Amino acid sequence: MLLIFWCISPIVLIPLLIFSSEKNSKNSKKVYVSEECLTWTKDGAKCGTIFHRDYEFYPNDHCGVLIPKVELNLKWVRQQIQPILYNQVIAKDAQGMLYEEQMANIEVDIPVDDNGEIDLAIQNKIYSEYYKLIQIKKNLENILEKYSI
């Protein structure tokens, strides 16, 4: 139950396992991403923030891209990996940084079935329950704000 990444640097492919991270520097040609993916903010004030994208976009040099090599519920992966990413950010008090080198070393447990295959159904169920909790939290925050409690 391990999540490892494919990290593609401008020079070499570092073999890891489930995701690819494409580096798009200012000197390289633009990469158009049309697959469902996760992205993370590589530097700056929001460094380590991860986003689920299911639309086409051009990542810039401040955006790391994780494209799945196997079928995963990326919303579930996002929910699992976000707390880990914040802990990996370098120089949090200054200009935070989280580059491909740090991402390549991050490990996340992935549920597997009795045959050792990635269990997409349990990812979907976990994320569904997580999403319900997020909605309850938002509703409570709205009530508290409405009544200034």
Stretch-by-stretch model annotation:
Residues 91, 106-149:
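Amphipathic alpha-helical coiled-coil/heptad-repeat segments
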Residues 1-110:
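DNA target-recognition domains and sequence-specific DNA-contacting regions of bacterial/archaeal
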